[in-house]
Swiss-Prot record:
<dbReference type="InterPro" id="IPR055135">
    <property type="entry name" value="PRMT_dom"/>
</dbReference>
<dbReference type="InterPro" id="IPR041698">
    <property type="entry name" value="Methyltransf_25"/>
</dbReference>
<keyword id="KW-0963">Cytoplasm</keyword>
<dbReference type="GO" id="GO:0060765">
    <property type="term" value="P:regulation of androgen receptor signaling pathway"/>
</dbReference>
<feature type="binding site">
    <location>
        <position position="166"/>
    </location>
    <ligand>
        <name>S-adenosyl-L-methionine</name>
    </ligand>
</feature>
<dbReference type="GO" id="GO:0042054">
    <property type="term" value="F:histone methyltransferase activity"/>
</dbReference>
<feature type="compositionally biased region" description="Low complexity">
    <location>
        <begin position="88"/>
        <end position="99"/>
    </location>
</feature>
<comment type="similarity">
    <text>Belongs to the class I-like SAM-binding methyltransferase superfamily. Protein arginine N-methyltransferase family.</text>
</comment>
<dbReference type="GO" id="GO:0035242">
    <property type="term" value="F:protein-arginine omega-N asymmetric methyltransferase activity"/>
</dbReference>
<feature type="region of interest" description="Disordered">
    <location>
        <begin position="67"/>
        <end position="103"/>
    </location>
</feature>
<dbReference type="GO" id="GO:0043433">
    <property type="term" value="P:negative regulation of DNA-binding transcription factor activity"/>
</dbReference>
<dbReference type="GO" id="GO:0006338">
    <property type="term" value="P:chromatin remodeling"/>
</dbReference>
<dbReference type="GO" id="GO:0006355">
    <property type="term" value="P:regulation of DNA-templated transcription"/>
</dbReference>
<dbReference type="GO" id="GO:0016274">
    <property type="term" value="F:protein-arginine N-methyltransferase activity"/>
</dbReference>
<keyword id="KW-0808">Transferase</keyword>
<protein>
    <recommendedName>
        <fullName>Protein arginine N-methyltransferase 2</fullName>
        <ecNumber>2.1.1.319</ecNumber>
    </recommendedName>
</protein>
<comment type="function">
    <text>Arginine methyltransferase that methylates the guanidino nitrogens of arginyl residues in some proteins such as histones.</text>
</comment>
């Protein structure tokens, strides 16, 4: 018995040595053809002998990998955590196939090729902390916007299958379930997914909401979805690049004609005066309990303005904005591509009153939720407007909802809101339904994104070189590029010229 097994083992090793450049499937096939491997005829009576090799997989994945390049293969994706049962071979192969498909997707659509780790360990670790989610969930303007937008979208969610990308605590998934969704798949790659499952159970929604832990791109879902919901926005809107996962979900997981909430977004830019920042962090050294500590002011300037980008500073005074903003970048979630998003170039010209303090540029963003349900008073207005359908001035006025600084829902029209907000978030699309806007513009109310300031190294007092003009021209070009090595980050380059006497030219490069 032992001699037969040793002989068989020797023959197999000789065969493997001859065929070492062939794949595992090829080796198994050759062994079977030559009748070298007959596991059914082996009667193993020694417990120390190895068990027979496993049956080849039912699902055959074609490949050309050889022993010469096997070390170059990427590590497999993390397997979805299932506490109740061990992952099966079929599940593992399905996960590997899902990652291969996502790699093929990014290889095709991303100008930088297949996605790297995106600093995943640090990124997802930070989103496992309750303190970070406390900041987001109790950002009353942020959470109120999603709550009201979802509550007013029952016509969108009724009996639909919904995907929550980056579910965090699961709060949006619960909102969606209560709005009438048939099924909600909540996905998060951080450990917060386990806490989300507790929240879902605690609120009696486990029959509707299923939580997945893992990267969206590596999960095989049981069905396509009708609606995608996500709070993907970062500082400067696109920081963290989470929007790429939303685009992936749209292209691979959503049925044709599906809906994404929020549906549109825009970034704005304007020259800005931030005396409040200077007074709080720099000029305050001039008088401290009757002591003149002004010698520290230049050191404070050097330290605070060294990196030039000041994140998470809220500008409360709308008058700090020195001219009407430009629309720096627009995003339609139904059509935006990763390639288009990866680079933005925009020229600008602002006219700023002479004598203004100019500290640099401020940026903010807005997102919109469209196709909200009609209220009873909306229906009444629509009926009245239909009676005067030939009168352009009496055409239908869709509701325009916003969230005030206290987190309360405000109903108005865009025309009225634009006046109240001093035109800081101009629309780039034609309103054709009831809409809710969540704005991070100065003066609209604090939120955890605040604004992003691109500050000069020192304060400038503007005075036009043309004495006939009351304003000073600020011209320039801004270029936004995704960092090729750390793709959750973005480079911001600015070429700026001030029409002063003498002319002032500058180039700054910021990393966000």
């Amino acid at each position: 018995m032992t001699d037969d097994y040793s002989k068989l083992k020797s023959e197999i090793m000789d065969l493997v040595s001859e065929e070492f450049l062939k794949t595992k499937d090829d080796i198994i096939s050759v062994m079977i053809e030559n009748n070298k491997l007959k596991r059914a005829e082996l009667v193993v009576g020694n417990d120390s002998l190895p068990p027979p090799p496993p049956t080849p997989s039912i699902v055959k994945i074609e490949h050309t990998t050889t022993t010469s390049n096997i070390d170059d293969l990427p590590l497999p994706p993390p397997i979805q955590e299932v506490e109740e049962e061990e992952p099966t071979q079929q599940n593992i192969e399905q996960q590997q196939q899902t990652q291969d498909e996502s790699d093929d997707y990014y290889k095709t659509v991303h100008p930088l090729g297949v996605q790297d780790t995106y600093e995943d360990e640090e990124y997802f670790s930070s989103y496992s902390k309750i303190s970070l989610h406390h900041e987001m969930v109790f950002d009353k303007r942020r959470t109120a916007a999603y709550y009201h937008a979802i509550s007013k979208s029952k016509n969108i969610f009724k009996d639909k299958v919904v995907l929550d990308v980056g579910c965090g605590t699961g709060i949006l998934s619960c909102f969606v379930a209560k709005a009438g969704a048939k099924k909600v798949y909540a996905v998060d790659a951080s450990d917060m997914a386990h806490r989300a499952e507790l929240i879902v159970q605690q609120n009696g929604l486990a029959d509707i909401v299923t939580v997945f832990k893992g990267k969206l791109e590596h999960i095989a879902f049981p069905e396509y979805v009708d609606v995608i919901v996500s709070e993907w926005q970062g500082a400067f809107l696109i920081f963290e690049s989470m929007i790429e996962s939303v685009i992936y979900a749209r292209d691979n997981l959503m049925r044709p004609g599906g809906i994404i909430l929020p549906s549109k977004a825009s970034i704005y830019l304007s020259p800005i005066n931030v005396d409040s920042f200077y007074n709080q962090y720099i000029n305050q050294w001039s008088n401290v309990f009757n002591l003149d500590m002004s010698p520290l002011i230049p050191f404070a300037q050097e330290e605070l303005l060294e990196e030039k980008t000041i994140r998470n500073y809220y500008v409360d005074n709308q008058d700090s904005v020195l001219d009407k903003p430009i629309i720096l970048r627009t995003i339609d979630l139904s059509t935006i591509t990763i390639e288009d998003l990866s680079k933005t170039v925009k020229t600008f010209e602002f006219q700023v009153p002479n004598g203004s303090k100019y500290h640099g540029f401020g940026s903010w963003f807005s997102v919109w939720f469209e196709n909200l349900d009609d209220d009873d008073d909306d229906n009444d207005n629509n009926n009245n407007n239909n009676d005067n359908s030939n009168d352009d001035e009496n055409k239908q006025q869709f509701a325009y909802y916003t969230i005030d600084r206290d987190g309360e829902l405000v109903k108005s029209t865009y025309q009225q809101y634009s006046i109240d907000s001093k035109g800081l978030t101009p629309l780039f699309f034609k309103q054709s339904s009831n809409v809710l806007e969540l704005s991070t513009a100065p003066g609209t109310g604090d939120q955890h994104w605040k604004q992003v300031l691109f500050l000069n190294s020192k304060e400038k007092i503007l005075q036009s070189s043309d004495k006939q003009l009351d304003t000073t021209s600020i011209k320039g070009t801004i270029r936004i590029l995704q960092n090729k090595d750390y793709r959750r980050h973005w480079w911001i380059e600015m070429y700026v010229s001030l029409k002063t006497n003498p002319f002032d030219y500058s180039y700054q490069k910021y990393l966000i």
